[in-house]
Structure formats: structure tokens, C-alpha cells
UniProtKB/Swiss-Prot annotation:
Similarity comment: family membership: Belongs to the LpoA family.
Protein name, as recorded: Penicillin-binding protein activator LpoA
Major location category of this protein: membrane
Classification of source organism: Bacteria, Pseudomonadati, Pseudomonadota, Gammaproteobacteria, Pasteurellales
Functional note: Regulator of peptidoglycan synthesis that is essential for the function of penicillin-binding protein 1A (PBP1a).
HAMAP family found in the cross-reference section: LpoA (MF_01890)
Species whose genome carries this gene: Histophilus somni (strain 129Pt) (Haemophilus somnus)
Keyword entries, A-Z: Cell outer membrane, Cell shape, Lipoprotein, Membrane, Palmitate, Peptidoglycan synthesis, Signal
Subunit structure: Interacts with PBP1a.
Key word NAD present: no
A Pfam family per the record: LppC
């Protein structure tokens, strides 16, 4: 009997480890490995890291987890096709992996603008099953769907929900920055009419945006207002992590000018250009007691001018105008160290340099404005007709970039070398679905192009740049261009003003010189508020060449004014009570 019992005990000892092993294996199949649980956490490595792990891992379940992590990060890196490829390889997923895969798929749908699909995918996910990290991703997708629908307030509300589940400081900062960007891109009237409905965090964000907008052009008051806001909302997420865009305001100092160096070509073939810009600059500063030292860049090298300016104690420069001189500064930024510089041109080499901004009358501004205007006018399949030269290529690139931002697709671009090419370019570029055409051409070419378009499709919406605006356009010509819209500087809105009549006489009604005068005028407006312009996000200046704001690399961006030919006259759009011609 004893021997039988002993044998039984020995059998139990033998089988117990085997039973435990099978039990644990069953748990792994049901719940996933301990590594699978990492899907519930943030993915902090790069996609390259997870891809290397995929190549190194032998365990099938861990391999699936690494593919999910790689796909998740690839989505955040905007590498959607690669992410989808990894998702397509997944097989035999456990419940935790299926749950995470569902989140990634919903995120991809939202990024692609498939809002209904993304919403349906989210509806299949039970929030109670998600970890805090996964819940933050869930609400990020909700926010993206709202953004796709241009519903910024709903996107902001989702971001607030998202913040509740973020523990990483960097992610919290990124979320605050995105929330602030949404607020800044929301119409002030919408912000003012939004009810926080007792949500203290939303109330704090709305108040912050309203105070910022109300005090944007009063920097000293703006800084004090932000401090007051912090005291009123001490526990707000933005009080702890102020949006990055606002953090620089703490060191803001108002612009004070005593001496300014103006660098222009004032002799040789470019003398007229330089003198016209100088006239505009001088007229703008006439009521300011600031000493201006003028340097002729045709007589001295840019290096000599900068050294001379430093010796004279000048710490603010306007210019140079010539591109080769701008490139000298871009390639040797130490030359302008400790100086404020407003270059009057930009080049393909332009880059971010401390205390340097680039200002010029670039075709890119008009092209971007045209893309936005056509989008707002419900044009969705535009044709862009441009000359086969530097102007045309720059215009086409800028329009396409803006169109990609608006619609996610490329614009249809057609180039022409000479007027004879235009007919072929139009017929080959137009399709039945084309609903608008943006044209870069001179005044005479524009009339020829419109004649062709009227024969092909007279219902097309037509847009042009300032290049086509000419003082030689008589009533008959203007009548022929009926309904065509074009962009130009706001200086042309009021042709009855004393300033306009003065400049019209000074330039002998030469539109190109009038543009240069307006540029010189605005150069003073910019340098006189240079710190405000550079350091206060959203700060704008209403100039003669447009509404001026600081873009990437401190490139001065211009919001253009749009005009329309109507019944033989030209009207600023939305101001049709006052004909300007």
C-alpha cells in the first residue's frame, strides 16, 4: 500500500511541471505574452527600431507585437503605405493585439479622410478595454476626424479628453501645441459664441485664445494679460505647459529704433528700382525721428557695407535687395550677428537665421493666395496655366504645395513657351470636370486665353495674378474680361486717395514701380515693429502690399487683395459699392 502511494506521489511530481507548462501556454494564447502587454503603453522608439526588432525576433507572438508597434509609429511618421503593409502581414492575433490593430486602422482611416469608416471602426472599440495610453490615441483619432470636417471646437474638445490620459510631458506639450494651433485657426466669432458648458479646461482654452486675439497688437498688454490668465486658471494644463508658440513672449522686448541702415542699389542700371523703394521707405518714416544711413550696394560690397554700419553703431539693417547679396548673408550669417536685418528679397538658399527676415514681392504669395481663393470659391479641379520660365515654375510649385495642403492632391499644371502654345496647353489640360483656371500671363495674353476658354467652356471660373493688371486696360478690354478675378496689392483699392495720386504721378502710372514704392513703404512698417513681427505669433501688419505676417524662416507672407472685372469696371471683391476704375 505504501509503495503504491509513493508511486502516486512520484507520478504527480512528474506530471505537475507538464500541467503547469500547458496551463501557462493556455494563458498566453488567451491573454498574450507579457511583451504583448506593452501595446497598452506609449511607443517611444522610432519605426526603424521596431523594424529591426521584427527582423531579429523569432517568437511568433512577439513578432506580431513588434509589427503592431512599427505600424503605429509609421502612422505618426506619415508613412501610411508601410504601416498598412505590416498590418496586412498580421495573423493569429490575440485579443490585446486585435484591439491595438483596431486603433491603428481607425487612425489610418482618419488620416485618409475616410471619416465615416474611422467612426465605425472606433464604434467597435470598447473604451473600458483600453489603457490610458490607448485612450489618448482613441481621442486623438476623434480629434482628427473633427479636423477633417473643419469642426475645430469638437477637435479641441477631443484634445482635452486626450490630455486626461497623457502622462508623458513631451506628449502633453505636443497636445497643448496642437490644441493652441486649432484655437488660433478658429474664427474669433466662433470662439466667442462657443459655450464651455461647465468644462473648466475648455473655458480656460477659449479665454486664453480670446485674450490673445484681443491684445495681439498690444504686446505689453498681451504679456500682462497672459500672466493674469495663469493666475485665474492655475491648474490648467496650459498654465503648466504653455504652448510653445507663447513661451517666447516672456523675453519679448518692444522694438526701439535709433539708427537704421538702408541698403539699396542706387546707381547703374538698377538705380530707378532702388530710388523708388527708397521713396516709399522715406514717406513711411516721415513722422518718426529715426536716423537713416543709406548705402549704395552698387558701389560697395555687402561685407563692406555691414562692417561700415557696425562702425557707425547701426544695429538694424533694411536690405540688401539684390539676390546675390542676400545669398552672401545667408552663406555667412556671422556677418550680421547681433544685427536685426530685413532683407528685401529671398533666394532658394534662404533659411532660418536669428534676427533675419526675408521680404519681397514674390510670385509664391500670389500663387498660395490663388489656391486658397479657388478653394473657398468651391473650385476642386483647377487647371494652372503658367509660362515655361522661372516665374512659371515658382508659381506652379507654390500653388501645388498649397493645393496639397487643402485637398491632398496635386494641381493640374500646364506650361506654355509662347502665345502660340496656349491653345494646345488649354485643350490638353482641360477636362470635363475642370471647374477653374488660374492664369499667369500679361494683359494681352490674358485676353487671348480668355477668348479660347470662352469658346471651350464659358462657365469656368477664371483667376489671374497681378502680372495681368495694367494701366493700359481700357473700358472695352475690361468689359471683355468680365467676371475674371485677379489678385494685386491693396494699394490699388483706393485710387482717389492723395497718396495714390502722388505715387501715380511720381511713377508716371507705371504699375511695376508703384509696386516697388509700396514695398519700400511696407519695409519701414516692418522694421519699425520688427520684434513684434518676429516674436508674436499671429502678429500682422496692414501694409500697402498686403496683410503681412511672418511665415517659416521669417519669410514675410502677404495676404493679397482680390479684384474682379464687372461691366467694364474693376471692383475689390466684397466692396462692390465702390468701383476703382
Amino acid at each position: 500500500m505504501l509503495s503504491i502511494l509513493m508511486q502516486g506521489l512520484r507520478l504527480k511530481k512528474c506530471f505537475l511541471p507538464i500541467l503547469v507548462m500547458f496551463f501557462l501556454a493556455g494563458c498566453v494564447n488567451l491573454l498574450g505574452s507579457s511583451f504583448t502587454a506593452s501595446l497598452k503603453n506609449d511607443a517611444n522608439a522610432s519605426s526603424d527600431f521596431y523594424i529591426r526588432k521584427i527582423e531579429q525576433t523569432q517568437n511568433q507572438q512577439d513578432l506580431q507585437t513588434y509589427k503592431l508597434l512599427a505600424a503605429r509609429v509609421l502612422v505618426t511618421e506619415n508613412k501610411i503605405p508601410q504601416a498598412e503593409a505590416y498590418l496586412a502581414e498580421l495573423i493569429d492575433l490575440n485579443d490585446e493585439q486585435k484591439l491595438d490593430k483596431s486603433l491603428i486602422e481607425a487612425h489610418i482611416s482618419a488620416i485618409k479622410g475616410k471619416n465615416e469608416t474611422a467612426e465605425y471602426q472606433l464604434s467597435l472599440i470598447h473604451l473600458t478595454l483600453l489603457s490610458p495610453s490607448q485612450k489618448s490615441r482613441y481621442y486623438e483619432i476623434v480629434s482628427r476626424i473633427a479636423e477633417n470636417r473643419h469642426d475645430n471646437i469638437s477637435a479641441i474638445k477631443a484634445r482635452i479628453q486626450m490630455d486626461n490620459f497623457l502622462s508623458d510631458i513631451q506628449r502633453k506639450q505636443q497636445n497643448n501645441d496642437r490644441t493652441w494651433a486649432l484655437l488660433r485657426n478658429t474664427d474669433s466669432e466662433v470662439l466667442n459664441n462657443t459655450d464651455a458648458e461647465g468644462n473648466i479646461t475648455l473655458s480656460g482654452w477659449l479665454t486664453l485664445a480670446q485674450l490673445y486675439n484681443d491684445n495681439l497688437n498690444q504686446p505689453a498688454q498681451l504679456i500682462q494679460t497672459l500672466l493674469t490668465w495663469k493666475n485665474y486658471y492655475p491648474t490648467h494644463t496650459a498654465a503648466h505647459l504653455l504652448p510653445t508658440e507663447l513661451q517666447g513672449l516672456a523675453n519679448f522686448q518692444q522694438t526701439t529704433l535709433t539708427q537704421v541702415g538702408l541698403i539699396l542699389p542706387l546707381s547703374g542700371n538698377t538705380r530707378l528700382i532702388g530710388e523708388t523703394i527708397k521713396n516709399g521707405f522715406d514717406d513711411a518714416k516721415v513722422n518718426y525721428n529715426v536716423q537713416v544711413h543709406v548705402f549704395d550696394s552698387m558701389k560697395m560690397s555687402i561685407e563692406q557695407i555691414i562692417n561700415q554700419a557696425k562702425k557707425q553703431g547701426i544695429n538694424t539693417l533694411v536690405g540688401p535687395l539684390l539676390k546675390q547679396n542676400v545669398d552672401v548673408i545667408v552663406n555667412n550669417p556671422y556677418l550680421v550677428q547681433d544685427l536685426n536685418v530685413l532683407a528685401l528679397n529671398s533666394t532658394p538658399n534662404a533659411r532660418a537665421i536669428e534676427h533675419l527676415c526675408y521680404y519681397g514681392l514674390s510670385p509664391e504669395d500670389e500663387a498660395e493666395s490663388a489656391a486658397s481663393k479657388m478653394w473657398n470659391d468651391t473650385v476642386r479641379i483647377p487647371l494652372v496655366l503658367v509660362p515655361q520660365n522661372n516665374l512659371g515654375r515658382r508659381t506652379a510649385a507654390a500653388f501645388t504645395l498649397r493645393w496639397q495642403q487643402l485637398l491632398g492632391t496635386d494641381a493640374n499644371i500646364k506650361f506654355y513657351n509662347q502665345t502660340a502654345d496656349i491653345n494646345f496647353a488649354l485643350k490638353s489640360g482641360l477636362s470635363e470636370s475642370t471647374d477653374g483656371v488660374y492664369i499667369i500671363a500679361n494683359n494681352k495674353q490674358l485676353a487671348e486665353i480668355k477668348a479660347v476658354l470662352d469658346n471651350i467652356n464659358p462657365t469656368l471660373k477664371l483667376y489671374a495674378s497681378s502680372r495681368s493688371n495694367s494701366p493700359n486696360s481700357g473700358p472695352e478690354h475690361r468689359l471683355f474680361l468680365n467676371n475674371l478675378q485677379f489678385s494685386d496689392i491693396p494699394f490699388f483699392k483706393d485710387r482717389e486717395s492723395e497718396q495714390y495720386k502722388k505715387i501715380e504721378k511720381m511713377t508716371n502710372n507705371d504699375y511695376s514701380l508703384m509696386h516697388l514704392y509700396a514695398m519700400g513703404y511696407d519695409a519701414w512698417l516692418l522694421i519699425n515693429q520688427f520684434n513684434e513681427f518676429r516674436q508674436i505669433p499671429g502678429f500682422t501688419i496692414d501694409g500697402l502690399t498686403g496683410k503681412l505676417s511672418a511665415g517659416p524662416n521669417c519669410n514675410v507672407e502677404r495676404d493679397m487683395t482680390w479684384f474682379q472685372y464687372q461691366n467694364g469696371s474693376i471692383y475689390p471683391l466684397n466692396e462692390q459699392d465702390d468701383s476703382i476704375i
